[in-house]
Every structure is written in structure tokens, then in C-alpha cells.
Amino acid sequence: EMSFMIDETGQRILRLIDVHKDQIIAFAEDIAAHPEPGYEEFCTAGKTAEVLKNLGYKVTEHLARTGVKGTKSIKEGPSLTVIGELDAIGYHSHPNANPVTGVAHACGHHAQMAAMIGCAIAMADPDVQKCLAGTVNFLAVPAEEYIDADKRARLKKEGIEFCCGKSEMIRTGVFDDTDIALTTHVHMVPVEEDFYLGNPACNGYSAERVTVRGKAAHGAIDPWNGVNALSITTSAIQMMGLMRETFREEDHVRLHNVIRKAGDVINSVPDEAIVETKVRAASLDKICEITDMVNRAYAGSAYAFGGKIEMEKLQGYMPIIPRAADNALIEAADDLGLNYRTVQKGDFNNA
């Protein structure tokens, strides 16, 4: 049951959402059924642009390749940007995964996009706009999930500098006119309530692409004349595993490796291996410290086998500082009678 505290404009917004409920849900289900990987969300972007145009927003497309921005200036005032993320995450075994790309909306971006569209529907109403001042932007951003280094190399030829869409949009000035950015996401910490208000602390990360150089030799006739790049890689990853006992729980360290290449043919000693390594932690100092440990593992293993390594630094993310829920969020949740809790000390998102 709604509280009497919601004003007439708020009541109208709620009615608009209810009236368009089926449209909003259908949009989410359509996006979920057609997942697309980062920087390739052409179908999702097209559907988003069409909805925003039909609502009367001034729409700009192809921002950072697939991004879409719908804008409406009402009166002089601050500029609010509501963000939705276009891409799906790699998850080949998901029942709704795209059979070609292997991505699925397992991270809930289809729900986030629907929330953005619901807000756009409400803000497009003339009676609602009469009560507002400023500019509202609806920004559908590409590539929130980290894209692999091979795709990054291809996109760099098209002028895309960053693996992640919001970073690329910051670089190209898309956020320059934004005073307030607002978004939502499915829960990333264990929460029983339906709504979780505020921002918990979150890991940042550093990423590298490591090329391991060995020496080819016949795997049966003279393997002793080779330097096995796969063995160097395996040894380095084993060292990282043995380091894990030094990681403190309060630093929230997470360490990931994906071997992209480990030789070409089975009867030759692999002379090249390619690994992508990611270090997550709660502070920049700890990210740098663990990254140095990882790099020593690669260097030490290469030295032991007589190989070489080449390292390419990839884009990372800074750790997120926790932010308490704004009073406006709490008051709105109370007025709507929602089942919620706010960010608490100790809440942490390891992603």
C-alpha cells in the first residue's frame, strides 16, 4: 500500500509505469532472448533507439560503436544520465545462451535496460515534464563485461581505445554533460530483500596479456632441444596457486587466468603460449602488489626453463568506494512499501 507522502507527480509516474508494464516486460524478455557480446550489441541498440525515438527523445546512435543516447532538455537545471548496459556475458552452458557467440544475459542487463526504458517512459510524459527542471539522458552503454584481447586488437583498428564501453565513452566525452549518473543492477552481494539501496565497496582489477616464448622441437625425436612455452605457463600458474595462502581475506583478492593459446600441433614442443591474467582486489595498492607477484611468477618460470615473456598491460578498473543510500531512495522505497535494506558496513562486492 502506497504512503500519502508520494506527491501528484509521483503518483502519475507510478500510473504510467503500471499502464506500460506489459511493454516494459516485453522489452526485457526480448533483450534476454537475443543476447549480444560487448561492442556487438547492434540489435539491442537498434531496439533501444527505436523506443527512445518513439517517446520523443533526441537520439544519438553509434556512440562507442553501439551506444545509444536519448536526451530531453526541459528547463535550465542539472543533467541526469540514467544508464543501462547493452551487453551479455560469456556463458556457453546457460540455457538461453546465443549458440553462436556463447553469451547470455546471466548478469541481468536485460532487467537493467528495462528499468531504464521504464524511466524513459515516465519522463517522456508532458505532465511529468512540467514539474521537472534540467536535462534527462538515457544512455545505453556497450561492453560492460570485459572483452578479450583479440577483440580489443580488432576494435582498436576502428578507433576503440578501451575494452569497456563506459571507459570509451568517458574518453570520447559522452559523459561530459552529466552532473548525476544513476543506474541499477541485480544484487551482487547476498541480500534476502527484494531491493538493495546504495553502493557497496567493490573490487578493482588489473589485467595483462602475457605472451610466453619458448623454442620449437619435435615432441618425440628431440624434445630436449625445445623450450616448452606451455610448461612455462603451467609452472607460472602453479606458482600463483601456491601464493594464494598469502592473500588476506580482507583484501578480497581474486586471481584469474585464461590460456588463449598453448602451441599449434601436438607433436611439436609448443614455442608460444598466450595467457590473459586478471588480478582483483579491494585497494589499488593491493592490486599492484599481487600483480607484481604474478609477474615474478611468469618471469621466474621463464628463467627456469630458458624462455622469455612479453607483457601487455590491458585496461583495468579502479576499486569502488562504498556509498550510503541517498535519502531520496530510502524515502521512495518507504513510500512504495518495498521490501529493502540499505548498504551496511562490511558489505562487499567481489566482482
Segments (PLM) and residue ranges:
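Predominant activation on well-ordered alpha-helical scaffold segments within soluble catalytic domains
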Residues: I25, G46-A49, I117-A124, K166-R171, ...
